[in-house]
Amino acid sequence: MRRVRTTRLFQVACAAIVALASSAMSAHATSRIKDLANIEGVRQNQLIGYGLVVGLNGTGDTLNNIPFTKQSLQAMLERMGVNIRGATIRTGNVAAVMVTGNLPPFATQGTRMDVTVSALGDAKNLQGGTLLVTPLLGADGNVYAVAQGSLAISGFQAEGEAAKIVRGVPTVGRIANGAIIEREIEFALNRLPNVRLALRNADFTTAKRIAAAINDFLGVKTAEPIDPSTVQLSIPPEFKGNVVAFLTEIEQLQVDPDLAAKIVIDERSGIIVMGRDVRVATVAVAQGNLTVTISESPQVSQPNPLSQGRTVVTPRTSVGVTEDGKKFAVVKDGVSLQQLVDGLNGLGIGPRDLISILQAIKAAGAIEADIEVM
């Protein structure tokens, strides 16, 4: 009797947790415009540069195998007044690297940004290295920042004569605040007559809801959806020359986004992610596994003594076929995501089989969602 009561209490508790989770999801269904869209033109710019990392403990590039590292080292030393042309250079403490970073929007001259340093040659480990002065160029070929500093490596490598241990990626590192911005990208935000919002997930309904929320807040028709990914805003007269204040008011408005039903499948890892609006029509699902087992057990034939025979190995192969009992279930019309998952789990289906079943249901026209295979 106590066990039955405990089970019932557990079921009631689970039901309460599910109800609370459902109400929490409903309460947080809306999102800020700030989280749904970006301001067109306000973005990062990618920078790239080529440089040298020094101070490596014999884990740098092999100069005989990587000619550009040797040439870069010679050119750098010559700029400093050291002439080594014709000399034999034998060092494993230098590595050629590519330096990348993202120039933040509205970054001013003299501020700093993070950079990522990646080995370009056959360096084994960048641990303990220092990046020398490296100009970072934009897509237009201009220098926007200069990077230099000590690398922080998350991975490591240790090896001996007969064994080696590698953890993480020791040939990639980061330099926090390792680049100084030398050139600014001009963007006159306050002089714009209108501003465009670029939706992160294009959707007609969401674009219309964003425009409606902005117009209701301002009391005038200021926002207009142009396409499923763009909403154009006309700057009201009271905000002329103060676009920042206008956008500050707009981006805090709450909107209920409308997302298309989609199932994302990663076949390599077996991960399946389904949206809340996935619906399935009536469909019957049967699943069974056919397993073929082939085992090799070679036998040794040993002749009797003085029989003029010889020892031979004879193959012996056994083949077995087993088929799991097929399980059959009917998924009713209009079931939700949770019901679909529960029904398929009730068949004892694993992630790999679930991928095939979802694709088959989609091919049968019974699933109302797009399937994206990664």
Swiss-Prot record:
Localization terms from the record: Periplasm; Bacterial flagellum basal body
Pfam families per record: FlgI
InterPro entries: Flag_FlgI (IPR001782)
Signal peptide segment: 1-29
Entry GO terms, CC: bacterial-type flagellum basal body, distal rod, P ring; outer membrane-bounded periplasmic space
Alphabetized UniProt keyword annotations: Bacterial flagellum, Periplasm, Signal
Alphabetical GO biological process terms: bacterial-type flagellum-dependent cell motility
GO molecular function, one term: structural molecule activity
Top-level taxonomic group: Bacteria
Chief subcellular location: periplasm
Assembly, per entry: The basal body constitutes a major portion of the flagellar organelle and consists of four rings (L,P,S, and M) mounted on a central rod.
The family this protein is said to belong to: Belongs to the FlgI family.
Function (record text): Assembles around the rod to form the L-ring and probably protects the motor/basal body from shearing forces during rotation.
Name listed for the protein in its UniProt record: Flagellar P-ring protein
Origin species: Bradyrhizobium sp. (strain BTAi1 / ATCC BAA-1182)
UniProt lineage: Bacteria, Pseudomonadati, Pseudomonadota, Alphaproteobacteria, Hyphomicrobiales
Gene that produces this protein: flgI
